[in-house]
Amino acid sequence: MSRFITLAIHTYEKALSLRTLLENEGINVELHNVNLEDPRLSSGVRVRIPEHDLPLALRIVENRELFADNGSPDRPAHTVLVPVDFSEHSYNAACAACEVGRRHNGSITLLYSYLDPYLAGKVQLTDTLSYETGERGARQQLEGEARRLMDNFAERLRSHMKRGHIPIVKVNREVAEGVPEDTIVDFAKANTPRLIVMGTRSAERKQADMIGSVTAEVLDEGRFTVLTVPEPLDCEAVLSPRHILFFSNLDQNDILAIDTLYRLFGDNESTVTLAQMPRKNRFSESAAEKALSRLTEYCAENYKQYRFETAPVRITDDDEFSRLQDRYGFDLIVLPNRRRNALSRLINPGLAHRIIFGSDIPMLVIPV
């Protein structure tokens, strides 16, 4: 039986509110050091929970706005969002999303956005569309073409489901007008998907034409869990990782991110290598090593399907990352991601960006 630990110390009213919030998510909560008959006699209340529920409790506390309306009937359950452009790399992403949906008894939502030709100054779908019918006719024609391509894309998925090539899940379709990255972010904010799965091209093609910038923009929003699926890989390889590289910030957000990883891919026996992110001077070298060691011990005790180890070096640049990849052969990278402002991104692009544009390894980016 898991021992109880103190999550927080609050006033009586706040402790009751937190207990209600946690119990609604299935967490057992005890209140200690308070006179429950007359709460005015107590200045503080310890909110205690089972130790194994700590990651979930931290996630709930850090994201109260996402859990407060959990009883809403309009809230979608276990939806996986797949932005598509009808290319092969977006089809690979859709196949991977079907497997995620099957594992978690959910559905997938295909999302395509098209640009108004009068605003974009170009034709996005095909060069054969005629805009001589006027602005209204052109928009109707463009939307009709978008829906036709979406229907064909969904039918291809259904055909492969029937043949047993990919799992059978419910497929929803959404077509909207707008800039792709803005449409994805707005849809995700409104529908809170469990995961966003995005296809990316090979590293060579991304470096050549900067394809993948839409994915980078979605990551910059920083509030969604995103799985990137590189073009050369198949779905099974992406969803059955054997060796995972986890970038650690050496704070409690690591526990949140590891718990998200385990909930998504915890049915596979995998090795997880914990590596230190480039950090500020708030940690000495010895303190950082102790913090990483404590994190490794905690994870080994609470996530039994995984075997945890620490990287022998701290990853500070792309060359160090490449050497580590050559040594271990990681097949999934997990990156806790903080939201960054535009200026800092321009001056010092984040590690997530560099991995997207410089490697062909699937990456799970988790907001913290």
Regions found by a protein language model. Name each.
Residues 3, 12-37, 71-135, 162, ...:
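Small/aliphatic-rich secondary-structure junction motif
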Residues 4-5, 9-28, 51-55, 59-71, ...:
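Structural beta-alpha unit
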Residues 33-34, 200, 276, 336-338, ...:
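Short secondary-structure boundary segments
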Residues 36-92, 115-124, 164-168, 194-206, ...:
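Intrinsically disordered or low-complexity boundary/linker segments at protein termini
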Residues 131-148:
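A short acidic, glycine-rich active-site loop
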Residues 143-154, 288, 292-296:
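N-terminal membrane-insertion helices
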Residues 210-214, 289-293, 347-352:
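Charged helix-capping and loop-helix junction motifs
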Residues 216, 259-262, 297, 322, ...:
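Active-site phosphate/pyrophosphate- and oxyanion-stabilizing loops and adjacent acidic/basic residues
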